[in-house]
């Protein structure tokens, strides 16, 4: 009888995992396949001046743990400043956005899993395709993520992909 990846355990060394690097470095340390799609663990190293696009997840809970640096988290109507050692938990349906003036290294846990598919799809896009707001919105939606409009031209502020 074969043992599934979810039952055999996994070790992910520093810098090891599925790496998606565009504006920031995103490393998927534990994939959905490792957990029977229960959750996934992602490390993100954000450059100074980083700002994500405002978005929410339809089904997934998202939890952030800050390892280095700091970031401001807009969670619904509340703004939270998170420094090293801070943890921010966001339930499904709650719009959120992350901004870091000086850079931040954080761990993100998504439950259920599925966000890596968005990272992979966005990583495969050309720079011109990444600027196509409708295309990126559709890719995000396919992976449980709804972009929140922030400007009159329909484009969101910030990056869709770390």
Q: Model-found features: residue ranges?
A:
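A short, N-terminal "cap"/entry segment at the start of jelly-roll beta-barrel domains
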Residues: 1-38, 124, 129-162
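Short acidic-glycine-tyrosine-enriched beta hairpin
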Residues: 9-13, 17, 34, 77-95
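Conserved short histidine dyad/triad with adjacent acidic residue
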Residues: 13, 28-29, 42-57
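Conserved hydrophobic/aromatic beta-strand scaffold that supports enzyme active sites
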Residues: 28, 41-45, 63, 79, ...
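Ligand-binding loop in jelly-roll beta-barrel domains
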Residues: 35, 72, 92-117
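Residue-level recognition of specific faces of alpha-helices
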Residues: 38, 62-65, 118-121
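A short beta-strand-loop-beta hairpin characteristic of the jelly-roll/cupin
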Residues: 51, 57-86, 94
